[in-house]
């Protein structure tokens, strides 16, 4: 929970213990605290530790810019009825991967007479219900064709398994602020993933 960052940060500063955080809902100031902790310990942050989501993010980073030229993009995410934040941290992370310079205005749902869709917007829709562990789909609507990229978590076990794998790969790293991509996909660590 974001409210626990201060005591956690004090502990990390005191001990130099490596940190893996998957907490979503941090403010930009709190993210700066995590980055600063990287000066005294190995710190890894990701809004989602699923390998599938990490791969989806890479796909969006690599192919998103060419798709945005000719396609309208909409993002739909689904989670259980107890999820507190919307859109989810993963949805925001995927939107950032697709549009890192925020050229698209992010529209949280639409309602009423809102007029024609602008080319410079990305609709983001959050559905909540039942026990859905997490689903994220990005739709690319073009002229006479639609492309979609999806990830569905059948259970929350994948997040724990990914965090454990990340912890194994973070072990022995020098102090620094690391991303999941750096840990999972760096050439030095690729062999260790097997």
What is the predicted function of each stretch?
Residues 18-19, 48, 80, 113:
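A short, structure-level motif marking secondary-structure boundaries and short turns
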Residues 1-2, 23-24, 49, 80, ...:
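Short loop or secondary-structure boundary microenvironments that flank
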Residues 6-9, 49, 157-160, 164:
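Hydrophobic alpha-helical segments
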